[in-house]
Regions:
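N-terminal, active-site-proximal structural segment of metallo-dependent hydrolase catalytic domains
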Residues: 1-69, 75-87, 130-132, 297-300, ...
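Stable alpha-helical elements in mature extracytoplasmic
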Residues: 33, 37, 56-59, 86, ...
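Structured beta-strand-rich core segments of catalytic domains in phosphoester-bond hydrolases
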Residues: 48, 53-161
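Catalytic metal-binding/acid-base residues of hydrolase active sites
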Residues: 55, 162-164, 209-212
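Extracytoplasmic/secreted cell-surface and envelope-processing proteins
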Residues: 58-61, 83-85, 167-170, 212-218
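Short, solvent-exposed aromatic-acidic interface loops
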Residues: 103-111, 163-166, 280-290
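Active-site His/acidic residue clusters
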Residues: 158-179
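Metal-dependent phosphoester-hydrolase catalytic domains
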Residues: 189-204, 210-322
């Protein structure tokens, strides 16, 4: 966040001066990392960029202004995050369709923590003295509808989310499992409602799932994806080799890094014919010489990357815009 509209002169500042421009309680993302993210996104050259952990609409506007040549329309609704990390989009200007964004941040997820359930069972007030019937999404599930003329007649819908992390500082839900499972089930409910309302419209589900939601070795909290929907991971549909799907690396001792896919785009059968062959991949960040960075095998290497998540890229082609 800046005091006023920033100028591109800010891009020439040293890091300490760059940080002083922020008027927020949160630091700016380091200038070099922000520039490297923009470099990667320009190389990918996507029409629609789906983003997690965005520091609000102002941050997204500034990123588009300073780093992306104002080529996109920033699109974000502030969610429920207590850490100021939202989900949002950058949508290329001049595309032959319109878009509409809706939030589900007020939707209940039909979940209380174990101690809250016990308190209500015995008639005690829950934390803070509030009578709580259910929590909401940790962040949000936003609905992006793409349409030609009538917003009620979209030709494609994208659901973007960032499910509950594995952090459990209050020690009330180990690894965030129950909350994440409840959020996933409510996400599926939203998906099914849209399927019913728009039966011939493909609905895509994307975001940071904070766990293994792939069809192989599926974490328990995500199994409903495969029993209740026909959604499939776009990398699975593209038949990308398993070792090429990692979007996050957990650095271990002894210079060992475990690659995991925790970021996903799930597409319905309606979209399978429109997935461009060989277009789906996980983008690897590059150095100043244009060479892909090695897998990070220690924390220094990991922290030097623009982000600890890698972009997932794919192309939908020849989809009727009706």
């Amino acid at each position: 966040m800046f005091d006023g509209i920033p100028s591109k002169d800010a891009l020439n500042l040293k890091e300490a001066h760059w940080q002083r421009l922020s008027t927020s309680v949160y630091e700016n993302k380091p200038l070099k990392k922000t520039q490297d993210i923009a470099k990667a996104l320009k190389e990918i050259n996507a029409d629609i960029i789906m983003l997690c952990e965005v520091g609000g609409l102002e941050s997204l506007n500034n990123f588009n202004l300073l780093f992306m040549d104002e080529a996109y329309s920033p699109c974000l609704i502030e969610g429920n995050s207590e850490r100021n990390i939202d989900v949002g989009f950058l949508i290329r200007k001049g595309l032959p369709f319109y878009f509409d964004l809706q939030s589900n941040k007020h939707r209940l997820i039909n979940y209380l923590y174990p101690h809250e359930r016990e308190s209500l069972t015995h008639g005690y007030p829950v934390k803070g003295g509030k009578i709580t019937t259910s929590h909401k999404f940790s962040r949000d599930v936003v609905e992006l509808k793409l349409f030609k003329t009538d917003r009620d007649k979209p030709f494609m819908i994208i659901l973007l989310t960032h499910l509950k992390s594995r952090l459990d500082p209050e020690r009330i839900d180990p690894n965030g499992f129950e909350r994440r499972q409840a959020e996933l089930r409510t996400l599926i409910e939203i998906y099914q409602e849209l399927e019913k309302t728009h039966p011939q419209v493909p609905v895509m589900v994307a975001g940071d799932f904070n766990g293994n939601a792939s069809i192989t070795g599926t974490d328990e909290e995500f199994k409903d994806l495969y029993t209740l929907t026909s959604l499939r991971d776009v990398l699975e549909v593209a038949q990308l080799e398993a070792e090429q799907r990692a979007t996050f690396y957990q650095v271990r001792n002894s210079s060992r890094a475990d690659g995991r896919q925790i970021d996903f785009v799930f597409i319905p059968p309606l979209l399978h014919p429109y997935l461009k062959p060989a277009s789906a991949y996980v983008h690897r960040y590059k150095d100043e010489f244009g060479m892909a960075h090695d897998i990070p095998r220690n924390m220094d290497a990991k922290l030097s990357l623009p982000s600890d998540h890698y972009p997932l890229v794919f192309e939908i082609e020849k989809l009727p815009l009706k």
